């Protein structure tokens, strides 16, 4: 067993550094459904199979045609005439022995007619190149069950993605440049006691130059506050004065020249970090005050039960503060001093997590859930990351398309720049209308391009008029979309495959933050944009 674990660690080494063992476990226990084994679809699955998605099912009733072989590297000449789902599944499964693949040789329309609940058994569903009418039916089915749907589409030199999920909660958002949780502005009792054991004025030189910078800042902060009415250095001028105060504490040699004490230089450098005020961010406050946090039920997810437990901790043991994160950065110090300081933060974090665990136990009992339904590991993970919680709520596709609920004002505002990527969204909606009316996409055959330009323009104007949008789209966009002929270039499919797989992994692992809710890629100009539509 240990050997198997070691082999997996070697195989997935790089990704384990990104999302950890628990993230990999979530990935390996996931079951993803792909609708349509197009070039885009197989590229997405490739990027999920390689990192070890547990199980995938391809739904596709089409047989492999010559055009599929032309733009899909996972299909061969010998595949022509065979079911596209089965052929793609067999070839994709060869990429990773740890992954299990299934296929359903039926169209999504057939499954939606026969058994809509079929799609509700998956961790998430990814659709590619679906017509609008089918997409709306699928989205409605999954919305009610809160099953995430990732819509992907490559259309000529345009890439499109839409995430549709009622609510997606993120514990490990991995923010860039996150501030340390040191609590030097309000030291907890264990830290205060440890600080009192240091006397920087009566130390041997070796000890003085190997004292952790956190201790150095804390000791001089006490001195500053005693001389400034208990206030923290706030303005730039005050912080510079505080740095000078620390600088004066550097030992001097017999000639009065300051010694080279790197720990003090480190303290001066980290003043802004150390003086960070302990407070709860507005985004986390919003989560803790959310109705789902306040009004728990038997259906409440573990995220909301944990959030409520943290809120109760803050009202009692936390005295208004979140549980301590329990980590400190690396620094210049001797091992003994650093480890003692590190352990003080760790033990305080464990103590806070234990208090939260008690709250969780009571809350689980109150909503009729078994105590083991939220593990100790989950509680500690939540406490360690509770300063960076995120909740993403997407609008439904029905709301986006509804005449009364569409974000018309936002679209008009964006179209003040006639070349904004939102114009590509409008064109995709127009070609869908074209397909609905004529049963094909514009420009499929070269001889139709010229005549289809006028028809597509009419569809676009009809769409704009229906939504009451007084907008003008440049003719060159209409002409370009007719020239695309609904082609799915592999270069665009490949780009989307990487981007979509990344979002899928975020959804499955509940790590990092997904976009909300629409992504447009303009390959002509190598630009992209996200919109909340």
From Swiss-Prot:
Residues 330-343 are annotated as: Interaction with uba3. It comes from Xenopus laevis (African clawed frog). Keywords: Ubl conjugation pathway. It comes from the Eukaryota. The keyword Transcription regulation does not apply. The lineage of its organism: Eukaryota, Metazoa, Chordata, Craniata, Vertebrata. Gene3D superfamilies: NAD(P)-binding Rossmann-like Domain. One of its GO terms (cellular component) is cytoplasm. InterPro entries: APP-BP1 (IPR030667), ThiF/MoeB/HesA (IPR045886), ThiF_NAD_FAD-bd (IPR000594), Ubiquitin-activating_enz (IPR035985). This is NEDD8-activating enzyme E1 regulatory subunit.
């Amino acid at each position: 067993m240990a050997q198997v674990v070691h082999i997996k660690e070697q195989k997935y080494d790089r990704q384990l550094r990104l999302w950890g063992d628990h993230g990999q476990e979530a990935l390996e226990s996931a079951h993803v459904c792909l609708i349509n084994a197009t070039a885009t679809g197989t590229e997405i699955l490739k990027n999920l199979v390689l990192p070890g998605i547990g199980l995938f099912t391809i739904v596709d009733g089409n047989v492999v045609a010559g055009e599929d072989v032309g733009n899909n590297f996972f299909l061969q000449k010998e595949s022509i005439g065979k079911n596209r789902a089965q052929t793609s599944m067999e070839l994709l499964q060869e990429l990773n022995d740890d992954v299990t693949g299934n296929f359903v040789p039926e169209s999504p329309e057939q499954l939606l007619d026969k058994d809509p609940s079929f799609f509700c058994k998956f961790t998430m569903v990814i659709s590619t190149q679906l017509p609008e009418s089918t997409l709306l039916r699928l989205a409605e089915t999954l919305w009610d069950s809160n099953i995430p749907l990732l819509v992907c589409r490559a259309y000529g030199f345009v890439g499109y993605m839409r995430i549709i999920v009622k609510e997606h909660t993120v514990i490990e958002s991995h923010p860039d440049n996150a501030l340390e949780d040191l609590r030097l502005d309000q030291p907890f009792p264990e830290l205060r006691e440890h600080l009192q054991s240091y006397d920087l004025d009566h130390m041997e030189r070796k000890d003085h130059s190997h004292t952790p910078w956190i201790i150095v800042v804390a000791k001089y902060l006490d001195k500053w506050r005693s001389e400034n009415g208990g206030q923290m250095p706030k303005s730039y001028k005050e912080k510079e004065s505080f740095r000078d105060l620390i600088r004066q504490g550097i030992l001097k040699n017999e000639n009065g020249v300051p010694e080279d004490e790197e720990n003090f230089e480190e303290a001066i450098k980290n003043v802004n970090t150390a003086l960070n005020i302990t407070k709860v961010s507005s985004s986390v406050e919003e989560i803790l005050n959310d109705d789902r946090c306040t009004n728990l039920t038997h259906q409440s997810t573990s995220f909301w039960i944990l959030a409520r437990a943290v809120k109760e901790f803050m009202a009692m043991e936390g005295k208004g503060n979140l549980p301590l994160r329990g980590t400190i950065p690396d620094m210049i110090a001797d091992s003994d001093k650093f480890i003692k300081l590190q352990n003080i933060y760790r033990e305080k974090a464990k103590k806070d997590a234990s208090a939260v665990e008690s709250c969780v136990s009571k809350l689980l009992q109150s909503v009729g859930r078994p105590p083991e339904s939220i593990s100790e590991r989950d509680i500690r993970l939540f406490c360690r990351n509770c300063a960076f919680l995120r909740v993403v709520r997407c609008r439904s596709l029905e709301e986006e398309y509804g005449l009364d609920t569409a974000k018309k004002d936002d679209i008009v505002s964006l179209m003040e720049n006639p070349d904004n990527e939102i114009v590509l969204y409008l064109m995709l909606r127009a070609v869908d209308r074209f397909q609905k009316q004529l049963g094909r996409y514009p420009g499929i055959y070269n001889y139709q391009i010229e005549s289809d330009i006028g028809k597509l323009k009419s569809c676009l104007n009809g769409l704009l008029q229906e939504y009451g949008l007084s907008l003008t789209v440049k003719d060159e966009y209409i002409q370009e979309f007719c020239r695309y002929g609904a082609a799915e270039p592999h270069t665009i499919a490949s780009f989307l495959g990487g981007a979509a797989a990344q979002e899928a992994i975020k959804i499955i692992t509940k790590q990092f933050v997904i976009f909300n809710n629409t992504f447009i890629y303009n390959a002509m100009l190598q630009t992209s944009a996200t919109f909340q539509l």
